Amino acid sequence: MKSSKYSYSKINLFNSCSLKYKFLYVDKNYKKDEGIEAFLGKLIHETLEWIYKKKIEENKTYYSLDSIINFYKEAWNDNWHYKILKYKYIKRKKADYFTSGVNFLVKYYQIFGPRFNQNVYKVEEKIEFDLGGYTIKAIIDRIDREGPNKIHIIDYKTGKKMLSDKEMKEDMQMGIYGLGLSSIFPETNEIMLSHYYLATNQFVSVNLSDVDTESFSDGLIENIQEIEKTESEETYVANESKLCNWCYYWKECPVKNGSTPSEYMR
């Protein structure tokens, strides 16, 4: 077993920009900077985790909408910090993002509240599994048991862009989740993988049986081997894209100058 552990976020960062991967995972150049979209998404995840965790651990059977919004508001205020950024050409203000979160939760409550009777089994579940001698780790937003041998993996999304069915079958993150749970629960004969988009309250789902898991596994191993080769040869490359506008490493990057075109929010 190789010593390094790999996650979707680690592999995906390498694929998007291997130089940024170096700054974060090799140089350990950690920064407190955080995009407002990521901050909002994190707090929505925390609020939904709170709902279902209390249901699982305390058998809570009823929630008022006020209690949910209050939890979200307190989490927002407690976690807000001076290193939160937004792309400077976006006109939305701090209050606009906060209100977006409230709207997500209100709509979610209208569909699933006040009792939230889904068959939720685990929330924010940490998993690790072996793939070709590599340790793959992940944190799954939610796992539902929808029958004695059926598992439903749900990943919350606060962005507007929805994947197509074809894109879901090829999605690395969901593929990792599916492989992980199929190895942890080998008796399970059906694993459903879903994105739940809070902006539209829609599922986009694919059954793991419809995913070419052998090809996916081979591709993931090749991806990790490419990372190892790049680390060994130190051949990191800056990949310029629109994602640079949200990058916190402009001062360190040889193809950029000065500060990121994002600005701190107040």
Describe the function of each predicted region.
Residues 31-32, 259-266:
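Short cysteine/histidine-rich metal-coordination sites, predominantly Zn2+-binding motifs
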Residues 16, 246, 255:
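Short, cysteine/histidine-rich loop/knuckle motifs that typically chelate Zn2+
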Residues 11-12, 16-56, 98, 102, ...:
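Nuclease catalytic cores
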